[in-house]
Amino acid sequence: EYRRQRQMCIRDREKLAKGTSGFTGADLENLLNEAALLAGRRDEKAITMADLQQSVIKVIAGPEKHSRVIPEHERRLTAYHEAGHAVVMHTLPDLDPVHQITIVPRGQAGGMTIFLPDEDRSYLSRTHLLNSIAGLLGGRAAEQLVLGDISTGASNDISRATQLARKMVGTYGMSDRMGSVAFDAGHDEVFIGRSMAQTRPYSEETAAEMD
């Protein structure tokens, strides 16, 4: 329907398909609407790949916050932070390639590094998960290395890395020390701070070891 409304000049359909992996029908509808608006503002009859790529980012992360004035030192910090993510993710194996880096604020984020998968992953290897954790912490590492200080900008990265590490140990059984056991199956309170009075099928010593 939307392709009938506007001619779409998409030379790299495979790249677009990778960038919209996991999108729902509503997401795709929103994507094409946003791309059509961008083309319309230029009085163009065709939607370009650039329009679609910008629309993908907007659907994922929200609109740009042009009204927000960012101090120069914060823009610099954000640039190094996002570059840190990109360098680590580009260097380590078994990770999705870097697609775009931006320091334009969107939603709650001051910037972001966007990755596009080469393929759909049904299973995640231990190498992929460990390297993903390293990539999440790459922004904090870049701040420390280049600026000599760290900021609260990595708080979401640290939270995601911690959750991923805990899943590797408690859900996926990927810890050499703990073995191939799913400790948190139905008992995730040890990881998310619920009451310790709830029944757990393992000892306090095991819980401490997992932490």
Regions found by a protein language model. Give the residues of each.
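Single conserved hydrophobic/aromatic residue that forms the stacking wall/gate
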Residues: 1-10
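A short secondary-structure junction motif
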Residues: 7, 59-63, 140, 144
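Short conserved motifs of the RecA-like P-loop NTPase core
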Residues: 11-22, 34, 66-73
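Structural motif detector for alpha-helix initiation sites
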Residues: 13, 25, 48-49, 126, ...
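AAA+ ATPase "lid" subdomain C-terminal helix
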Residues: 20-50, 57-65, 86-98, 168-175
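Short, conserved phosphate-binding/catalytic loop or strand-edge motifs used
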Residues: 53-58, 107-109
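Soluble catalytic regions of large protease machineries
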Residues: 76-79, 86-211
